[in-house]
């Protein structure tokens, strides 16, 4: 059994079926991409897997425990972290304060998220450690508002790591980045996965990144899984090439 199991998940919105009998498994330590055209159901699938939406049928298991329909805050406590396509950070706070606030919530000290570091030295140390994982520890007193888009995504990854996840879900981690920032982000994700033993599941439109970092790929089209396999298997799949990779392959 994988660390994450998606079993026959179906989800509709009114008369629109966003997901239809979606099923795949993610192994511990794996880097897994979920790809598909716009409207394929990727965001809906992520929302079901993280508790923001309940499936109409089917289930999601994490470490063998059913989590579909479980509130998002409980999903986080079970070990799943998530970052979003649009950065979700406090712009008026420093990098240190952003991560520290997430740690206060994790440790049940949310009553005073703006407390001075000396009041909770263990959290201060952990905050700097997490910022170090994403290469931002030397800028911990910088306001989040002045960060580049790429560094804001790094900060959001740090905030996600504050929940101490064993599985991290990333929605378009390189969206809006320059080519240089994208390469840096890919290197960062590889480093985090290796050094922290994290399982990564991500969506991404940049096929160079998808095929450069993924160990397994699941392909969605109109809410249905049309392929699931290694990058080599996905590239060679005629249905995928026709439905999604045509332009990229032609290049």
Language-model region placement:
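Glycine-rich phosphate-binding loops of nucleotide-dependent enzymes
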Residues: 1-251
